[in-house]
Each structure stands twice: as C-alpha cells, then as structure tokens.
Amino acid sequence: MKEFKRYSGVILKHKDEVLLCKRSPEESLPNQWSLPSGHIEGKESPMEAAIREFKEETNIKLPSKLDLIGFINKYQKDGVTKKGMMYVFFYESKKELTPNLEKAKDGHEHTKCQYFSKKN
C-alpha cells in the first residue's frame, strides 16, 4: 500500500506580499516557487511541523501559534498527480522577516526566497 504523505506549509504575509522560495534544481519540484513546507515527522502536530520546517528552510523563527487556513490533498510531482495532505498555515508579520538560506539547516533546498505581491 502506498504511504499517505502528510506535509505542512506556511504562508507568511507582510503588508500586501507573501514569501515564496524557489526550489533548488537538485531538489524535488526543481526550480519551482513554493511555500516553505515539509513532512510531518513522528508524533508532531501539523502546526509544529509547519513551524519547524519554516525555521529549517528559512532560518526564520515563527511564533508557536499559527492560523490553519486550509488543506491541499493532491499535488503534481514529475507530471503525476499524487495524493497526500498538506496543512496550510498563515502568519501575518508586522515587520519584514528576511530569510537567511546560508544559516538555515535546510537552506540548500532553495536557491532564493522573496516576497511577491498579487501583481507578480
């Protein structure tokens, strides 16, 4: 039986922009812009995973409480639709939080991160 994968991701908003990160060409989903996200490990909650993954990928520490805003249960990988569950959390920051990929534990997963507005 195929494993049902569970992930968590965070939409970080500052003013009218959200933070996205461009996946490394060597990682899954190469060169795609996405939310900082990753697998839920062991017995951690989806929110704990979202906060941990965000820190590991961006070196930004988020508060311990985020708003759950939705779920994604299908995704594309290598041109194939796969099933899984991604919990999507939201955090709005009053100040711009700047990722530091060089200091991030898993910063190698991305080539850069930047804020995008609806216009982009």
PLM features: residue spans?
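Predominantly a core beta-strand signature of beta-propeller blades
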Residues: V18, K65-L66
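A conserved beta-turn-beta hairpin within the catalytic core of GNAT-like acetyltransferases
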Residues: E27-N31
